[in-house]
UniProtKB/Swiss-Prot annotation:
One of its GO terms (molecular function) is proteasome-activating activity. GO terms for cellular component: HslUV protease complex. InterPro entries: AAA+_ATPase, ATP-dep_Clp_protease_ClpX, ATPase_AAA_core, Clp_ATPase_C, HslU, P-loop_NTPase. Its main location: cytoplasm. It comes from Rhodopseudomonas palustris (strain HaA2). ATPase subunit of a proteasome-like degradation complex; this subunit has chaperone activity. The binding of ATP and its subsequent hydrolysis by HslU are essential for unfolding of protein substrates subsequently hydrolyzed by HslV. HslU recognizes the N-terminal part of its protein substrates and unfolds these before they are guided to HslV for hydrolysis. Transmembrane segments: none annotated. This is ATP-dependent protease ATPase subunit HslU. ATP binds at V18, G60, V61, G62, K63, T64, E65, D246, E311, R383. GO terms for biological process: protein unfolding; proteolysis involved in protein catabolic process. It is found in: Cytoplasm. SMART domains: AAA, ClpB_D2-small.
């Protein structure tokens, strides 16, 4: 679990996301409260429940990007899911308990990666012995092995092909039972049963350098205690797990509507116990959801937050509104983030030997076009900038291999020449921008 202060979390998010200070503060405080709770003792720790968050704002303003960046910062089991992927229990599709099962799998992968690092040195030695067995045979003399070991460590044998035995992937998707999402019966996965029956090794032909990571991971896994690993992962999910529920507005039941809305309301009802706190059976054991933090987000273009079930509204006590992007925000998005669009395009074309330069007037023109099209067609926020940039740089990207060594300067006139007319013609921009 990360021990960043709220101010440090916000400054990390500022490196990639423009504006939206309220949303950044809310998630920073929620993340810090996870750490604070773990410093408490016994009974009080159990009583402190997470304050779940509902983020409301139009599309393309940074809701999902905040989740993506938070996942990297959190150093905790984190899962982002779309609410529209799930159906009410009894309908064909995935039920919401699959969220927790998936979160457990994420946690196991995280813990395994961390523990592999602890046994890395021993795994490297064992993997090296397996490569030597493949090169000179298990019965070779110590002198021969030492000679090949030296060559192996200096990289002389990197391109040599060897045959190695690796673990065959288990579990086939064909063994799923209708109405049992993920092939789950209680806490047993059908896929796992068949995976164990067919858990054999297979021979693969690889170069020495390609086989290295595969063999090191296999040898590391042999040194790990799988039961302890799973227990640690479940503990991490129960105490530090974070679920980001995107598109929650799409499962709202709007006033005066009926028919296909039944399943939507059912999904909301199924989410209630999960967010409030329940026990979910997974193939690795029971998982309590009382202390998992849920962050829900939605554009709420058509539905309103009040269209959510009252019980669900009560379980998302912290409301954060994200603002629509202004012209100044668009301009900052093009230049300020560490991986801004302009930096990406400059780096991409640099690989062809083309140096791309953007004048301040070009950046202003790009922001103006994006804002104009958003206001006349459909407001899709910062995503409009990608469409505009692709259109402006279309000719340059196409001809870049023939223009190596050139320096191309983009100014306002160049932007207007490529997208100016389209931005003014609403009918055309509906289809092209």
């Amino acid at each position: 679990m990360t021990d960043f202060s709220p101010r440090e979390i916000v400054s990390e998010l500022d490196r990639f996301i423009v504006g939206q200070a309220d949303a950044k503060r809310a998630v920073a405080i929620a993340l810090r409260n996870r750490w604070r709770r773990l410093q408490l003792e016994g009974a009080l720790r159990e009583e402190v429940l997470p304050k779940n968050i509902l983020m409301i704002g139009p599309t393309g303003v940074g809701k999902t990007e905040i989740a993506r960046r938070l996942a990297k910062l959190a150093n905790a089991p984190f899962l982002k899911v779309e609410a529209t992927k799930f159906t009410e229990v009894g309908y064909v599709g995935r039920d919401v308990e699959q969220i927790i099962r998936d979160l457990v799998e994420v946690a196991i992968a995280q813990v395994r990666e961390k523990k592999r690092k602890d046994v890395q040195a021993r795994a490297q030695i064992a993997a090296e012995e397996r490569v030597l067995d493949a090169l000179v045979g298990p019965g070779s003399s110590p002198a021969t092995r030492d000679s090949f070991r030296r060559k192996l460590r200096t990289g002389e044998l990197n391109d040599k092909e060897i045959e190695i035995e690796t673990q065959a992937g288990g579990g086939s998707p064909m063994f799923e039972i209708p109405g049992m999402p993920g092939g789950q019966i209680g806490a047993i996965s059908i896929g796992d049963i068949f995976g164990k029956m067919g858990g054999r090794t297979k021979t693969r032909r690889l170069t020495v350098v390609d086989s290295h990571d595969i063999l090191v991971n296999e040898e590391a896994d042999k040194l790990l205690d799988n039961d302890q690993l799973v227990q640690e992962a479940i503990n991490a999910v129960e105490n530090n797990g974070i679920v980001f529920l995107d598109e929650i507005d799409k499962i709202c039941v709007r006033d005066g509507r009926s028919g296909g809305e039944v399943s939507r309301e059912g999904v909301q009802r199924d989410l209630l116990p999960l967010i409030e706190g329940t026990t979910v059976a997974t193939k690795h054991g029971a998982v309590k959801t009382d202390h998992i933090l849920f962050i829900a987000s939605g554009a709420f273009h058509i539905a309103k937050p009040s269209d959510l079930l009252p019980e669900l509204q009560g379980r998302l006590p912290i409301r954060v509104e994200l603002n629509a992007l202004s012209r100044d925000d668009m301009r900052r998005i093009l230049t300020e983030p560490e991986a801004s669009l302009i930096k990406q395009y400059v780096a991409l074309l640099q690989t062809e030997g083309v140096t791309l330069e953007f004048g301040d007037d070009a950046i202003d023109a790009l922001a103006d076009v994006a804002v104009a099209v958003n206001s006349t067609v459909e407001n899709i926020g910062a995503r409009r900038l990608q469409t505009v940039m692709e259109r402006v740089l279309d000719d340059i990207s196409f001809g870049a291999p023939d223009r190596g060594g050139e320096t191309i300067r983009i100014d306002a006139d160049y932007v207007q020449k490529n997208v100016g007319d389209l931005a003014k013609n609403t009918d055309l921009s509906r289809f092209i921008l």
